[in-house]
């Protein structure tokens, strides 16, 4: 958008000329004591000779935005609606999974409202009712966010370049406006069908495993490999005809299963619900378990480039993930056994009772199974 120094057309050219990109995204990180830290991440990269210009451009695109050009902002909103709708439809498995988690998980509630279906609906409503009052609220939001008192900075560079970049945190002013937490308002939805002009579905189901008495463990990474490769792939992909499927376990307690470009709906949910039965009877020889363990280790210990190292260190800093905790999880992975995997059967029996389902896709298929969903809406 327009800034105090650059107009709407000039700014992208400057960014492309002097940096490797300036991006922003919202995220929510859970700390090891269960608290949620909601942040707006701004990332930028540049060659050493362009560091000063990069700092100026970051300042312009965050703290020096010009909210007086209403028409330019309106065009940005329309462009964002178009791009976000395309992303949500093309990545329906991610969209549905995040939405299902948002029904009960505070962090994913924030994620949905700042980058998912909740955000998309907000943008559509903002475009429909765009006026001076809405513009003033956007300006107020920017002032609340871009405050030096709330800033955490992470830098990755060569040692000789550190002096050039170490004061980047000084670009923001201290504003002392305070915090606004309304964005965390709970979604009053249990299960949902979201209709799109599609012939297939993305089917996701989620639950909070901590409410079933379980805690996060490195063993869950091994369990994910087993379920992805041995159960879901066979039942949902091979036999069911979906293009993809998977599951995941989140530190905060969220667990979910999803399908990608799935011709089925009710059948897929039934497969999710029978995961406990599969685990009760699970067996594997030593070689197979070793392969599952190696796959899990690969997700926690892999080579990272400089940008990835910075992002990883930043997340661990905010979340309070220490080296001791990471080693504990490695040990849990390496000591995983068939018996450990079978012990999670009860967790999936609890998962089977969860009402939190999100299906994105075909209208006829969703309406035919409306007894599984307490809310049915159109994407747009």
Residue ranges and their predicted role:
Residues 10-184, 240-380:
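Charge-rich, well-structured scaffold segments of protease-associated domains
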């Amino acid at each position: 958008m327009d800034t105090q120094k650059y107009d709407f057309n000039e700014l992208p050219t400057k960014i492309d000329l002097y940096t490797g990109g300036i991006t922003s995204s919202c995220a929510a990180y859970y700390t090891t004591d269960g608290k949620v830290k909601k942040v707006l991440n701004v990332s930028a990269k540049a060659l050493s000779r362009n560091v000063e210009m990069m700092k100026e451009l970051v300042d312009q695109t965050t703290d020096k935005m010009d909210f007086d050009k209403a028409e330019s902002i309106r065009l940005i909103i329309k462009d964002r609606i178009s791009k976000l709708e395309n992303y949500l439809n093309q990545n329906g498995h991610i969209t549905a999974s995040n939405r299902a988690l948002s029904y009960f998980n505070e962090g994913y509630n924030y994620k949905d409202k700042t980058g998912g279906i909740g955000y998309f609906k907000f943008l559509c409503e903002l475009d429909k009712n765009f006026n001076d009052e809405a513009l003033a609220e956007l300006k107020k939001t920017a002032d609340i966010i871009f405050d030096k008192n709330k800033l955490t900075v992470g830098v990755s560079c060569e040692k000789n370049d550190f002096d050039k970049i170490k004061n980047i945190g000084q670009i923001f002013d201290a504003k002392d406006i305070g915090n606004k937490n309304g964005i965390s308002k709970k979604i009053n939805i249990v299960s949902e069908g979201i209709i799109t002009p599609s012939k297939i579905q993305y089917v996701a189901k989620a639950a909070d495993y901590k409410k079933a008495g379980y805690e996060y463990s490195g063993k869950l990474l091994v369990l994910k490999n087993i379920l992805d490769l041995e159960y879901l792939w066979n039942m949902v992909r091979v036999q069911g005809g979906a293009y993809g499927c998977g599951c995941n376990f989140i530190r905060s307690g969220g667990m979910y299963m999803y399908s990608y470009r799935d011709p089925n709906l009710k059948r897929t949910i039934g497969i999710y619900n029978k995961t406990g039965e599969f685990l009760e009877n699970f067996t594997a020889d030593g070689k197979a378990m070793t392969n599952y363990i190696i796959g899990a280790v690969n997700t926690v210990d892999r080579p990272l480039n400089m940008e990835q190292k910075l992002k990883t260190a930043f997340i661990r800093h905010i979340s309070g993930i220490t080296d001791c905790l990471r080693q504990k999880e490695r040990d849990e992975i390496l000591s995983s056994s068939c018996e450990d995997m079978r012990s999670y059967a009860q967790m999936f029996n609890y998962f089977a009772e969860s009402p939190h389902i999100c299906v994105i896709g075909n209208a006829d298929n969703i309406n035919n199974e409306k007894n599984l969903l307490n809310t049915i809406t159109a994407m747009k």
